[in-house]
Amino acid sequence: MFGFGEAKEHRDAVYEDKHEGKLSHEVLAGGAAFEAMKLFEDRQRKNGEPVKHAFAKEVLMGLAGAEVDKLVETKGLDYIDREKAKRHAEKQAEHLYQEQYGDMDEYNPERRGRHEATDY
């Protein structure tokens, strides 16, 4: 699993770079997981409500899978094993969440700021 720094690099490679060659499912999954974490953070901080870890992880896994689908379709990545990339993205998203909030009782936007890598 990747930490925030490497996951952010994967996100940038997938979402911003004009890739000439083929992306691996690991890079795609890492980028999708990072973007899912960013989307989750943005939404939860806007709402300002604490949520249980199980719910947060469930939401993140759904967002990560949706991001993989979106990327495969919009970037013409038909050669990617979509289901493998989704599973990897879900695990990576859970890992990022655990790294940032796993030591807390629940996700509470009032108790801890977002990871600095997601400030863009």
What are these regions (language model features)?
Residues M1-V27, E35-K57, E67-Y120:
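N-terminal leader-region detector that preferentially activates on the first domain or presequence
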